[in-house]
């Protein structure tokens, strides 16, 4: 990977440098009050201990956005107080074949594009940030999208709720990198969440991760490569340097490119 992030020693084993400083721009260095650069796909972070970090609301909602939150969201929002339906595909009408999850969908660009491109797949979008939820609701209404359900809580709780082996794919795209060492425990990718994803994914299901922050890419690789249930689907450098086919670039991804930061695109298969 770029910048000496991933290296091979003389015996061919992968070596990681996760102690290097990251270049996440405009991050606030105050404990407990971190506001990331504008446009990130995941301005809020949750992890397996049930803790919540970040912000749930930004700019004041416009009148129509507030109306969507009040009237449309209740029809699409998942309530996880009771057991999940089995099969999980029963969440969707009309019937679908597979269910995928996107964690921290931000403005919803990638999730909307995937839902439109795959009408036979059901999508669950997890995003506690109210403004992001309002944006995606506007697109769902405008395009009459029927294969998206939404969850406004802790994604780790959602992973624990879905039946084992019920997800075909999990996407985590440009998550908050929490670049300061003392904040690394706030990153979504932790041993506990990797275990939770392993349980939720079907055999041969995929976890896909995108970030322009080298340190978080190395962190994610280190966690997934030591997980016994995941295989890294990369055979050559272009497999992580270039987006997979038909990938929809997000607003934050375009911003990162303009500022000279190249993203890495990591794919892991559930064994």
What are these regions (language model features)?
Residues 6-101, 109-118, 137-165:
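S-adenosyl-L-methionine
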Residues 101-103, 126:
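Conserved beta-strand/loop positions that form the S-adenosyl-L-methionine
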Residues 106:
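Conserved glycine-rich SAM-binding loop
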Residues 129:
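Conserved SAM/SAH-binding beta-strand->alpha-helix loop
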Residues 188-203:
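A short glycine-rich, Lys/Arg-flanked "PGG" loop and its adjoining helix->strand segment in the class I
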Residues 203-211:
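Conserved beta-strand signature within the Rossmann-like core of class I S-adenosyl-L-methionine
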Residues 216, 220-271:
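Class I S-adenosyl-L-methionine
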